[in-house]
Amino acid sequence: MIIGCSASQKLAASVADLLDEPLCPVETRKFPDGERYIRVKEEVEGEVTVVQSTGYPQDENLMELLFMIENLKDLGADYVRAAIPYFGYGRQERRFKSGEAVSAKIVAHLLEAAGADEIVTVNLHENCLSEFFRVPVRELSAMPLIAEHISFLDDPVIIAPDKGALGHAREVSDILGCECDYMEKVRISPEVVETRVSDLDVEGKDAVVVDDIISTGGTIVNAAGILGKCGASSITVCCVHPVLVEDALLKIFSAGVERVIATDTLKSDVSEISVAPLIADVMKD
């Protein structure tokens, strides 16, 4: 049985289609005071997969997921797999300042307490997040899907906007068999720090910036400006999770980016690539 919660109903339907399984009808709504109501409209037994990203509004989507997991267990499900394509609160995996809550750890504990038997997610922002769980965690990578989607480019070079994203960029470049580099900050003087492509010459090439998350777009705008000055013939931006806060897309396109491509872990105007095949493959195992 497959269930799609409010944030991922279309994605859940795609997974169900790929597996030729029915999508369980559910009712989700809010009471006038804002509290959440959920109802599963079919008998529940055996293994159930719940698909729900926990992006904005994070608290509402997370609470709905917790309600659904525990409700399914109460209704008779033997095994509940929580497929969380985008894992909200995943960027607070440690205390950056004294007294801060480690949000990712708390969310992990809540999911387990609700009764999740397994977590399936896509490209966690920090690899250590899986260590917060005692139940199995299967982290899937959407980079092969991104590589396939941009294979039409004649002379691509894959660029990580910072060293932290280099692993993602290399995964794409290895699949395509093309060059890869990253943006690095170089101190020119005590007062001046310059950001530039580390080693690679991008002049006349199709530059593809690859990252896991685009939020405000600031990092991408900076990278696009540098790539433009270095003579890239075109600039494409790819990400797994299009958080895209406020006018992020406008800023990115205004910086000279030709196209922005993302997956459907989150709904957006640029979610061209579906991660449904990744989730479906897990359920076949």
Swiss-Prot record:
The residues annotated as the active site are: 185
Chain positions recorded as ATP binding sites: 33-35, 91-92
Q: Which family does it belong to?
A: Belongs to the ribose-phosphate pyrophosphokinase family. Class III (archaeal) subfamily.
Indicate the secretion signal residues.
none
Per the record, GO CC terms?
cytoplasm; ribose phosphate diphosphokinase complex
What Pfam families does the entry give? Answer: Pribosyltran, Pribosyltran_N
Q: Which CDD domains does the record cross-reference, listed alphabetically?
A: PRTases_typeI (cd06223)
State the protein's purpose: Involved in the biosynthesis of the central metabolite phospho-alpha-D-ribosyl-1-pyrophosphate (PRPP) via the transfer of pyrophosphoryl group from ATP to 1-hydroxyl of ribose-5-phosphate (Rib-5-P).
Q: Which UniProt keywords apply?
A: ATP-binding, Cytoplasm, Kinase, Magnesium, Metal-binding, Nucleotide biosynthesis, Nucleotide-binding, Transferase
**Entry EC number(s):** 2.7.6.1
Q: What protein name applies here?
A: Ribose-phosphate pyrophosphokinase
Q: Matching NCBIfam families, A to Z?
A: PRK00934.1, ribP_PPkin
Q: Which organism is it from?
A: Methanothermobacter thermautotrophicus (strain ATCC 29096 / DSM 1053 / JCM 10044 / NBRC 100330 / Delta H) (Methanobacterium thermoautotrophicum)
> Which GO BP terms sit in this record?
5-phosphoribose 1-diphosphate biosynthetic process; purine nucleotide biosynthetic process
Residues that bind Mg(2+) 2? 162
Compartments where found:
Cytoplasm
Give the reactions, separated by semicolons, that this protein catalyses.
D-ribose 5-phosphate + ATP = 5-phospho-alpha-D-ribose 1-diphosphate + AMP + H(+)
What is the UniProt remark on how the cofactor binds and its stoichiometry?
Binds 2 Mg(2+) ions per subunit.
Cofactor section: Mg(2+)
Positions bound to Mg(2+) 1: 125
Instruction: Please give the pathway this protein is involved in.
Output: Metabolic intermediate biosynthesis; 5-phospho-alpha-D-ribose 1-diphosphate biosynthesis; 5-phospho-alpha-D-ribose 1-diphosphate from D-ribose 5-phosphate (route I): step 1/1
Q: Which GO terms describe its molecular function?
A: ATP binding; kinase activity; magnesium ion binding; ribose phosphate diphosphokinase activity
Where, by residue number, does D-ribose 5-phosphate bind?
187, 211, 215-219
Q: Which InterPro entries match?
A: Pribosyltran_N, PRibTrfase_dom, PRTase-like, Rib-P_diPkinase, Rib-P_diPkinase_arc
**Superkingdom of origin:** Archaea
